[in-house]
Amino acid sequence: MGIAAQPQPLTKKDSPMVVEYIRYSVPAERAGAFLEAYQRAGEHLRASPHCLRYEVSRGVEEPNHFIVRIEWDSEEGHLQGFRRSAEFRKFFELVKPFVSDIQEMKHYRVESAWGRP
């Protein structure tokens, strides 16, 4: 039996990648429109070379809570690259109706991670 792989800490010098978390509380009657907006807005995230991946997750216990997780190549790539692009303007137009539902929107740096292939 082999030894389980241990998470390896990452430091700023190892990777400038940042993860943006956006937490939403969306009223039930708007949840479908929210998911549709992000489905369409995802096209503009995918078009950006600064966006590495994204996901939209819905709360199991509280289905009106959503977390949008976006991995960016760097904080600068997000704020100076994507946010100044035509893709951002198209993206924001789609998600703008839900800005008032945001509870948190911040960048985080991964310090430790592990996963299975």
Describe each PLM feature range.
Residues A5-Q8, G32, E87:
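Intrinsic disorder/low-complexity segments
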Residues S25-L35:
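Short, surface-exposed ligand-recognition loops at beta-strand->loop->(often short) alpha-helix junctions
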Residues R40-L52, E71-K106:
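An amphipathic, aromatic/His-enriched active-site/gating alpha helix that lines ligand/cofactor pockets
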Residues M1-G2, F34, Y38:
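Short, intrinsically disordered, low-complexity terminal segments
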Residues V18-S25, E55-R83:
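Short, well-ordered beta-strand segments in beta-rich or mixed alpha/beta enzyme
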Residues E29, R40, E61-P63, A86:
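Short alpha-helical
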Residues G32, E76-H78, A113-G115:
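Residue-level signal for secondary-structure boundary sites
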Residues G2-V18, E55-I67, F92-P117:
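Glycine-rich beta-strand-turn "strand-cap" elements at beta-sheet edges
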